[in-house]
Amino acid sequence: MTELTETLELKLVEPNAHKHRKLCETKQVYQDALEAAFNANCTTQSAANDVVVNYDLSGYAKNALKKYVPQLCGGSYDAKELHDDHPVRFTNEGPKLDHKPQNAIEWYVQIPHHDDYHLWLPATPNPEQREWLEALHAGDAKMGECRLFTRDGEWYFHIVATRDVEERETSSAATPIRVDIGEASLLTVCHRDESDSPTAPN
């Protein structure tokens, strides 16, 4: 078995005014918490927790921050400054995916806002990733970290998904070569003598 990883993209379908405001609130508070933890140079999850615990975010966003900030502060990223438009990260326990094939918009994603309040939003996926989404919904793939962000004025949600696939067997035997009719005709045409009669190639 081989483990494959894919980042699935869902575009959130025109959130109403209330949900749009809640998404904006989550994004702003997350950015504030991220900046505070980064400026405090939190190199451990415990140090990051001491900062982000004071912010009005879901536990899933706080847990993602506790993992992410130490990577920025001397870890794998070792960033010197912070970009002002980071995506909101969530650990995989919070977001949920639902599929209603009978609806015009089939896919719905649950995005945590606070610990006791979540937003369900309709979403349109990348058509080429439908098989992955169906596997994720059926439990045949695992959800990893999720990210909420805006692009060109639209809201998007990314889900990192992994699943196991069977390895294809490779044969050591010679692979037969097939020639289609068009190629066969081309070979015949290419090997004719001066009188236009077929001849064996040199």
Regions found by a protein language model. Give the residues of each.
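Nucleic-acid substrate recognition interfaces
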Residues: M1-N202
